[in-house]
């Protein structure tokens, strides 16, 4: 009964398929595995026995009768946004897509309810089904936006494969627990599941491990089987902490079908303290503008250390390796100009936020670090609020004869009385990056008030106030 029941459990949810850039694909995608590995993007291959011949042959489009392969990677919606920690697996998918293969980004609308224990020292905080559904919807939008930017801004003239977004809730939400355990559970051995490093480390921890977390690798293995059956997916991509889960999927599929599938891992990106970049570690840099602005994302990469930037250029960009070598030669000559970091930041910001987001990040950089009046004049309200997140925002009417001290007081930027007056005369106040020392100076449009109807008031070294003038 097991095989018929498994086929029944594997109904295809056609309504949740989203495709990007699917076209007829020409043969001849050379070095599909060699190029990303040379960039340091592919870390481990599983099983090792198949990586010398079977896996390269799978992706060799020059062979007669060869067809595009399908590769997938999972993204659990434990938060409402992707973050920098997700970028490498996404870039891995994009490299396969660029070589003419089809890729699937799988949102874990069901698996997120259990919580992946891989790489964690304690259990995740439980999420409600409603929260997970909302997060899954947000992740789908984020994945679609990144795929659209990739297709629009990084085309290389080759025909690409398709980019598909699925949600595993489509095949898990209607399954009955007893049926699932009866048909799927019998194919997993407890000794093997208990031997995984992710399980061992948690069992030895003071908190232990819940049954839900323990069962996570079974559901992920079933995801792989489902995609193998319905989309011909033979390769799973994941972070290096996912190898145990990938192995479970390989063993499950091989046991049921006798076919070989494969796993590829990408390196984990860590902070300077060695912590994995992610929201759980409290150091997430988000790929959602509402949580991390294009300027903040840009600056995150501009601030990378010299000893990391070449590696990051290879990992996070599509730039050819000879071009990266040239960038590094320029960087070594004048490291203070941060040529390599700026190119890295530009490429990543453009992929995540599009050309408009990159332009915004550069405007904000000029306005904040180079005191550019020209940049301030063309900044939108949103950009100013993103740049000066702690700034107070006021809307004021420009009355005839409005002075510097009037403006400061209406914006609640200085105290009343002599103390506030002295703050101006002693040089503690600037408007639009220009110091003002005469409290009675009348505001001048074009100097104190920019063309976009805004004024940036700075008190001391760190206190900013944004004023939007009405009825100009």
Curated annotation (Swiss-Prot):
Main location, first listed in the record: mitochondrion
Lineage: superkingdom: Eukaryota
Annotated residues for binding of L-tyrosine: 72, 116, 216, 220, 223, 242
One Pfam family from the record: tRNA-synt_1b
Database matches in InterPro entries: aa-tRNA-synth_I_CS, aa-tRNA-synth_Ic, Rossmann-like_a/b/a_fold, S4_RNA-bd_sf, Tyr-tRNA-ligase, Tyr-tRNA-ligase_bac-type
Residue sites binding ATP per the record: 76, 269, 279
GO molecular function: ATP binding; L-tyrosine binding; protein homodimerization activity; tRNA binding; tyrosine-tRNA ligase activity
Record EC number: 6.1.1.1
Record field: catalytic activity: tRNA(Tyr) + L-tyrosine + ATP = L-tyrosyl-tRNA(Tyr) + AMP + diphosphate + H(+)
PANTHER family, per the entry: TYROSINE--TRNA LIGASE, MITOCHONDRIAL, TYROSYL-TRNA SYNTHETASE
NCBIfam families (UniProt xref): tyrS
Role played: Catalyzes the attachment of tyrosine to tRNA(Tyr) in a two-step reaction: tyrosine is first activated by ATP to form Tyr-AMP and then transferred to the acceptor end of tRNA(Tyr).
Protein's name according to its UniProt entry: Tyrosine--tRNA ligase, mitochondrial
Organism: Mus musculus
Name of encoding gene: Yars2
């Amino acid at each position: 009964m097991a095989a018929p029941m498994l086929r029944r459990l594997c109904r295809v949810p056609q309504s949740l398929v989203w495709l990007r850039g699917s076209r007829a694909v020409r043969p001849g995608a050379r070095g599909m595995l060699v190029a990303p590995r040379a960039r340091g993007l592919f870390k481990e291959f599983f099983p090792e026995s198949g990586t010398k011949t079977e896996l390269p042959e799978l992706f060799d489009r020059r062979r007669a009768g060869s067809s595009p392969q399908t590769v997938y990677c999972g993204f659990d919606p434990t938060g409402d946004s992707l973050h920098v920690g997700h970028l490498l697996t996404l870039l891995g998918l994009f490299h396969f897509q660029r070589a003419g293969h089809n890729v699937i980004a799988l949102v874990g609308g069901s698996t997120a309810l259990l919580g992946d224990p891989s790489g964690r020292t304690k259990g995740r905080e439980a999420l409600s089904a409603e929260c997970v559904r909302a997060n899954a919807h947000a992740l789908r939008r984020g994945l679609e936006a990144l795929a659209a930017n990739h297709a629009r801004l990084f085309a290389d003239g080759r025909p690409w494969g398709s980019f598909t977004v699925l949600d595993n809730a489509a095949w898990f939400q209607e399954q009955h627990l007893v049926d699932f355990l009866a048909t799927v559970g019998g194919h997993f051995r407890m000794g093997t599941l208990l031997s995984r490093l992710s399980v061992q480390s948690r069992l030895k921890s003071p908190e232990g491990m819940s049954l839900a977390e323990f069962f996570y690798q079974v559901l992920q293995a079933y995801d792989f089987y489902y995609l193998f059956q319905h989309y011909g997916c033979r390769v799973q991509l994941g972070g290096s902490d996912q190898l145990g889960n990938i192995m479970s999927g390989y063993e499950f599929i091989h046991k049921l079908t006798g076919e070989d599938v494969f796993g590829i891992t990408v390196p984990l990106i860590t902070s300077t303290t060695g912590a994995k970049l992610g929201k759980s570690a409290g150091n997430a840099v988000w790929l959602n503008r509402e949580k991390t602005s294009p300027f903040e994302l840009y600056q995150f990469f501009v601030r990378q250390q010299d000893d990391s930037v070449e590696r990051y250029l290879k990992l996070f960009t599509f730039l050819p390796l000879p071009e990266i070598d040239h960038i590094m030669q320029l960087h070594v000559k004048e490291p203070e100009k941060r040529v390599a970091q700026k190119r890295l930041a530009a490429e990543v910001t453009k992929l995540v936020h599009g050309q408009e987001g990159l332009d915004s990040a550069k405007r904000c950089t000029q306005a904040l670090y180079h005191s550019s009046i020209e940049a301030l004049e063309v900044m939108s309200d949103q950009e100013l609020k993103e740049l000066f997140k702690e700034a107070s925002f006021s809307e004021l009417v420009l009355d005839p004869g409005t002075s510097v001290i009037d403006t400061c007081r209406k914006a609640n930027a200085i105290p009343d009385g002599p103390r506030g007056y002295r703050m101006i005369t002693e040089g503690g106040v600037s408007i639009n990056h220009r110091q003002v020392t005469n409290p009675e100076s009348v505001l001048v449009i074009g100097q104190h008030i920019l063309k976009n109807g805004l004024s940036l008031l700075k008190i001391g070294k760190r206190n900013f106030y944004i004023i939007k003038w009405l009825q100009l």
